[in-house]
Amino acid sequence: MSKSAVSPMMQQYLGIKAQHTDKLVFYRMGDFYEMFFDDAVEAAKLLDITLTTRGQMDGVPIKMAGVPFHAAEQYLARLVKLGKSVAICEQVGEVGAGKGPVERKVVRIVTPGTLTDSALLEDKETNRIVAVSPDKKYIGLAWASLQSGEFKTKLTTVDKLDDELARLQAAEILLPDSKNTPQLQTASGVTRLNAWQFAADAGEKLLTEYFGCQDLRGFGLDGKEHAVAIGAAGALLNYIRLTQNLMPQHLDGLSLETDSQYIGMDAATRRNLEITQTLSGKKSPTLMSTLDLCATHMGSRLLALWLHHPLRNRAHIRARQEAVAALESQYKPLQCRLKNIADIERIAARIAVGNARPRDLAALRDSLFALSEIDLSANGSSLLETLKAVFPETLPVAETLKAAVMPEPAVWLKDGNVINHGFHPELDELRRIQNHGDEFLLDLEAKERERTGLSTLKVEFNRVHGFYIELSKTQAEQAPADYQRRQTLKNAERFITPELKAFEDKVMTAQEQALALEKQLFDGVLKNLQTALPQLQKAAKAAAALDVLSTFSALAKERNFVRPEFADYPVIHIENGRHPVVEQQVRHFTANHTNLDHKHRLMLLTGPNMGGKSTYMRQVALIVLLAHTGCFVPADAATIGPIDQIFTRIGASDDLASNRSTFMVEMSETAYILHHATEQSLVLMDEVGRGTSTFDGLALAHAVAEHLLQKNKSFSLFATHYFELTKLPEAHATAVNMHLSALEQGQDIVFLHHIEPGPASKSYGIAVAKLAGLPVRALKSAQKHLNELEDQAAANRPQLDIFSTMPSEKGDEPNVDSFVDKAEEKHFEGILAAALEKLDPDSLTPREALSELYRLKDLCKSVS
């Protein structure tokens, strides 16, 4: 395409677009942002806006689409959610200042990982950008959040890369454009950069200049050992500089993260435990949505961070626990006060990049004053002492903002009335000129009436014609010679006088001067605030931490969470543990014990589908996870030994993008666990081997269980339907059988959801199918085939599946409506009698009594 064949404005656009070929360009044209050529076609499709044309190039109409500049944020938000980056090109020159088109330039680039505008961000989600730099041995990771100032780096390996990205939940991933770049499971939000931008030497130079130091050893980074991590951090910092058109002032140092800081969880574990997202991709009900009682958005984001980063440092955990205990009598008034706190963290970020708005500063001022009034009793908690000591440090900033910013400023700086009265004498004088014009006009009107003797004379103003003197048609002919005609109306004439024109010029000039001065003063306030960014970020972090800790206190008090104990020996002991999410979704939840130690490391868990095996296993993992965040846990008591990682293999689905079947996904996850789990790991395995034939599945499940017992020696919960596996405790002393009980009566089945010793006796598969609504004909056919299989199993001896039962007598007709014989009824009566015998009403707490009452009621219903 030839530039000479288009207008000067389009030539300017093409020059700007050539520098941003991989982005959509929002090109400012008056009150619109316009897009051209392929950008217009793509934007019209993504945003559902009209595609039209503007001008021609080489005789071909130029495709064009546009959005109003005042509504641009909503369109940008939609594009960013789709993973698009947008270059914002503004008019920076004066209209008509030269012969060519008004000067324009790209003032910022909006990308998924570098957002600071509140309209483009989810309130309760942290927005991170991650850079990935590989070499032959390691992968260097660096990540940052422009909202919080977080800036960290880490060394990892190829096999752990996807797990790290799942932990960080990156909105944008920077990758070198080279053949050595590893393949990622996610392709969304990926930005390719030239490989040379990840060079360690260039990265170290940029980082040392930014932090004002000679080398990076103070950050724990050695030039040779951490070269790829330094390269990633340098590429990331440079990318932020390029997209924001400035070097950010608020990145909070650079820290090197290691695996030993947090309990490890791979991507499958985070997904299966539904920490912040359900298996179906929803935000609720999840662990996060269930626990989030936070009063601020900052607190909610920190809570999500803590849930994804359970601590291993016992001292830090205990410090949080002590703070939670200290707040149990104070959390309600504290949360009431915190509800008045704005999102200081994100306001500070907008101050840092220079796009804070007037009401941001007003909200910051009010929030800092509110924080300074928080009065807490630390009750021996050193963490609370540290947190509450932060807030008085920001009082000088609050006082400055009180003096500088109107109590309720305008939304936009261009509308004026932002800088407070008394802050600047010249601005006050300019405002006086504008605001006291009414007095001048009244005085002028009275004076002119007296001078001219014209009774219809009025002095008025409108935005089109400015100031004027109006006379009726009958008196207009008597106007003095110094009255210059300005406008003729049907029944009146409007005039201007030299005195009124001089006043008009003064007022208009004062308005322009006041707006210009307000902008200058506002920019000065922002610049001064940038020097206080460390204190603001510190206050934001302290407020968020207080919010989360008070939420933990609320959970302890209102949901009967207890403080877990930590041991230095291998143990997971939980008394009457509850699933923190499920118990909020059901009327009655059955609590269960868990006992794992050096004598019992693997629990073989059997029982019917829908019996609660998966819920129980997840419950144990979530209690362990919560304990390591400093939160109290849903149980009567809990003692937990050293834990380094949590693994889960629960459920699976096809990975069509990678051409992997459900069974292949299952085996890949299992292999990862067997290669990485240690003696201090917690492993959840659900029905390993079910995706293939019975013999293959049984063999694989047996091998996996033995590997966990003999090699990994991890704490393991192993749910299975293979009866052969229940013999493992005979050969391995550290394995133990447990089952979830259920009862059948007539056509009904009752799931007791209670963990009991020993293996389950049968599957209840057909009963569950009946509950699911299978047709009677299909159920009868299933019962018939089950009996035939049982006959074959009895003849061939091997009993491969726990679903097998004793074969029926020859000649017996299968009866789908008869699930329980008299022996089972007697067995049930024995269970009920034993349960009643064991009850000691005087020793039960109200909650325990209620739980037992519901359980006995369910038992009675099953035989009624």
UniProtKB/Swiss-Prot annotation:
Q: Which GO terms describe its cellular component?
A: cytosol
Q: Which Pfam families match?
A: MutS_I (PF01624), MutS_II (PF05188), MutS_III (PF05192), MutS_IV (PF05190), MutS_V (PF00488)
Alphabetical list of CDD domains matching this protein? ABC_MutS1
SUPFAM superfamilies from the UniProt entry: DNA repair protein MutS, domain I, DNA repair protein MutS, domain II, DNA repair protein MutS, domain III, P-loop containing nucleoside triphosphate hydrolases
Please name the GO terms of the biological process aspect recorded for this protein, alphabetically. Answer: mismatch repair
Annotated ATP binding sites? 607-614
Keyword Amino-acid biosynthesis among UniProt keywords: no
Instruction: Name the InterPro entries on file.
Output: DNA_mismatch_repair_MutS, DNA_mismatch_repair_MutS-lik_N, DNA_mismatch_repair_MutS/MSH, DNA_mismatch_repair_MutS_C, DNA_mismatch_repair_MutS_clamp, DNA_mismatch_repair_MutS_core, DNA_mismatch_repair_MutS_N, DNA_mismatch_repair_MutS_sf
Q: Which UniProt keywords apply?
A: ATP-binding, DNA damage, DNA repair, DNA-binding, Nucleotide-binding
Q: Which GO terms describe its molecular function?
A: ATP binding; ATP-dependent DNA damage sensor activity; damaged DNA binding; mismatched DNA binding
SMART domains tied to this protein: MUTSac, MUTSd
UniProt family annotation: Belongs to the DNA mismatch repair MutS family.
* HAMAP family, sorted: MutS (MF_00096)
Which purpose does this protein serve, as stated in its record? This protein is involved in the repair of mismatches in DNA. It is possible that it carries out the mismatch recognition step. This protein has a weak ATPase activity.
Q: What is this protein called?
A: DNA mismatch repair protein MutS
